């Protein structure tokens, strides 16, 4: 399997390129606009044909490369069915499978960080977007986020996965590249709670500043 993890320093965003082998179909998860040419060059170097681009949710801290990649490659653009994005050509439902040339992903609806947040499982790993981070979780105070929904997504959808499941988030701010469900259950400070109310108390009092790109990124990612 080809599995590439790329990093955007400005927004601390991880992008993933996945394919079964050289010369096959590929998909990209959570691409950043400024790196579009890097992605296409890498695809060309590996003789890969991009067929799907997935965004885990409408991002507020960077402009997605989804629309630009669609323009350049004629790939399908994929998000969960709750998205309001006008860029998307395929909306997937909760538990729906995405198949490309030997690779299978399964969509999980995980609202909380935003109301359109989805995670995607693939074999031994899960792409968690901003829902579950390494030693953290996504904020819930904008884009129709909801801390109790986030708690349910975390504890009823993600943390029930096998503990050895690898966690690949959309962001990391400390140089971590991946974790596991077991490690997050044991060590993630935001998951050491006993109820949705306790989790909401933490999340509703973070008092974080809005992302610098929010006023530009959200409209761009909704409208292309």
Describe every region a protein language model picked out.
Residues 12, 23, 31-107, 186-197, ...:
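Active-site HxH/HxHxD metal-binding segment of metal-dependent hydrolases
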Residues 152-166, 170-224:
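Accessory terminal helices/loops
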Residues 31, 58, 82-83, 113-114, ...:
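Active-site metal-binding loops of divalent metal-dependent hydrolases
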Residues 25, 86-88, 135-143:
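A short acidic, helix-capping loop that chelates divalent metal ions and anchors anionic groups
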Residues 138-145, 184-188:
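Short glycine-enriched, charge-decorated loop/helix-capping segments at active-site entrances
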Residues 53-63, 110-115, 167-174:
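Histidine-centered catalytic micro-motifs
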Residues 17, 97-122:
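Core dinuclear metal-dependent hydrolase active-site scaffold
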Residues 1-48, 119-129, 135:
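Conserved beta-strand hairpin/beta-sheet module of binuclear metal-dependent hydrolase folds
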